[in-house]
Amino acid sequence: NSNSTFEYLDYELIKKNPKIICGYSDITSLTNIITEKTGLITFSGTNFKTIATDETDFSYKEALNRFVDGSLKFGPENEEYITIQDGTAKGELIGGNLSLIRGMVVGKYSIDFTDKILFLEELGLETDPAGISNHLYYMKQNGVFKKIKGLWIGNYEHESGITLEKIIMDVLDGEYKFPIIKSNNFGHIERKTVIPIGTKAEIDTEEDVKIRLIENCVQKGRFFLDSI
């Protein structure tokens, strides 16, 4: 996992030399800690391997839209966003793979969840749904869900019918009022939208496209450049 590199990174050097880093899964730890320690924008999404093996041109176009054009929209254009809990929220985006985010809740290399919009996805539903539940309870017991402004769930579903959404809602148990949405355009799937970590976004469950960026991550000019 990329968290094994944390103590060896020179965060001041990284901050003075902003580039782009983009990845998913195990890269979740690296992108979030760089944003936390430096204030730079990093990205959750496609990587060079995905672009090279994607039989469609979605990954390539998505990278151009985010890194070059600074698009405020999340692809694809026809993506369905589903409301789980109504509401509106504004905040900086943080998140990625649930198992890795859980490991950044407390400690020297923790991240600040205050007033953030948290996005989560998870592959482990196939093998360890109980473990996923434990991760979420750990986050709940350490106050994560009291701090965030909104939640965006990747719609990964195991063939058994178990969904990340169901496990999350069981853990939250109606105790929180922030808006919750889900979509199927990020995480361990072929077509990955690129999500800029540290950029402000807005959730509005009354809209067809229920989440959008409200600042341009390219114009901000504080991102890190080396796709993994």
Model features per residue range: what roles?
Residues 155-228:
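ATP/nucleoside-binding phosphotransfer catalytic cores, i.e., glycine-rich phosphate-binding loops
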Residues 19-20, 40-43, 91-92, 116-118, ...:
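Structural motif
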Residues 109-164:
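Internal helical hairpin/lid segments
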Residues 28-39, 189-197:
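Glycine-rich, charge-decorated loop segments at or immediately adjacent to ligand/cofactor-binding or catalytic sites
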Residues 9-34, 41-47, 177-180:
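Short, acidic/small-residue loops that bind anionic groups at enzyme active sites
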Residues 39-102, 106:
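Conserved anion/nucleotide-ligand pocket segment
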Residues 1-8:
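Long, hydrophobic/aromatic-enriched structural stretches that serve as scaffold segments
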Residues 26, 101, 151, 198-201:
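Buried hydrophobic positions in well-ordered alpha/beta secondary-structure cores of metabolic enzymes
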